[in-house]
């Protein structure tokens, strides 16, 4: 039995045949996939086509009860998912270190900053200090956005100074880059990175 930090029991997802997967329409307003699913498929596409090497970091697990039916075998009877101390994804693109977090919200007017934790913000600041490319991919308001870490830090610092505890919809639209949903890749965030960090005419937004 594996449990999340909130005590809920982990239920593995049912497998989906490759035939059914190919029939999914690339519509973000009516899709069967989560943001994580879309990003995993995107990263697989990048890897297969030798574009970038980006992987999702495994969720740390704390094992609390192990049964040994045989001397050479062990059965985990109880374990808990631990809260990650960093971000969801990391890897490399054109020699630059890539590190990002992925978040979703169903809020219709703003993106709550409570979706982040202090240690994640600190980790992203450390990545930026080492000249890494760090950002957040946000699914909100029926759209996917690419928000640079520096912009997130502004909203976070505002919250820490007893300011607004969320990013308004208009603020996100003003400071983030919308990512169009495609088929292969589904969420082409590398194209945004290319424009921001590798294009001769690149320029950060805002």
UniProtKB/Swiss-Prot annotation:
Listed name of the protein:
Holliday junction resolvase RecU
Query: Which catalytic reaction applies to this protein?
Result: Endonucleolytic cleavage at a junction such as a reciprocal single-stranded crossover between two homologous DNA duplexes (Holliday junction)
A single GO cellular-component term from the record reads: cytoplasm
* Biased composition, class Polar residues, residue ranges: 8-32
**Where in the cell does this protein reside?**
Cytoplasm
For region Disordered, the annotated ranges are 1-34
NCBIfam families named among the record's database cross-references: PRK02234.1-2, PRK02234.1-5, recU
Q: Which Gene3D superfamilies match?
A: 3.40.1350.10
Q: How does it assemble?
A: Homodimer. Interacts with RuvB.
Top EC class, one word: hydrolase
Q: Which gene encodes it?
A: recU
For this protein, the parts annotated as crossing the membrane are none
| Organism of this sequence | Bacillus subtilis (strain 168)
Q: Which InterPro entries match?
A: Resolv_RecU, Restrct_endonuc-II-like, tRNA_endonuc-like_dom_sf
């Amino acid at each position: 039995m594996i449990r999340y930090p909130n005590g809920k029991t982990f239920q593995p997802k049912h497998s989906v045949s490759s035939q059914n997967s190919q029939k999914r329409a690339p519509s973000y307003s009516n899709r069967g996939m989560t943001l994580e699913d879309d990003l995993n498929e995107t990263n697989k596409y990048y890897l297969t086509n030798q574009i970038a090497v980006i992987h999702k970091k495994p969720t740390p697990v704390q094992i609390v009860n192990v049964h040994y039916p045989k001397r050479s075998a062990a059965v985990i009877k109880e374990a808990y998912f631990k809260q990650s101390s960093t971000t969801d994804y990391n890897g490399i693109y054109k020699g630059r270190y890539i590190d990002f977090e992925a978040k979703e919200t169903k809020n219709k007017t703003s993106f709550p900053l409570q979706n982040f934790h202090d240690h994640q913000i600190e980790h992203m600041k450390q990545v930026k200090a080492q000249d890494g490319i760090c950002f957040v991919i946000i699914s909100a308001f029926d759209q996917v956005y690419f928000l640079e870490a520096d912009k997130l830090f502004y909203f976070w610092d505002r919250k820490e100074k007893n300011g607004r505890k969320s990013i308004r919809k208009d603020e996100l639209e003003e400071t983030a880059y919308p990512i169009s949903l495609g088929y292969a890749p589904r969420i082409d965030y590398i194209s945004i990175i290319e424009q921001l960090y590798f294009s001769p005419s690149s320029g950060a937004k805002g």
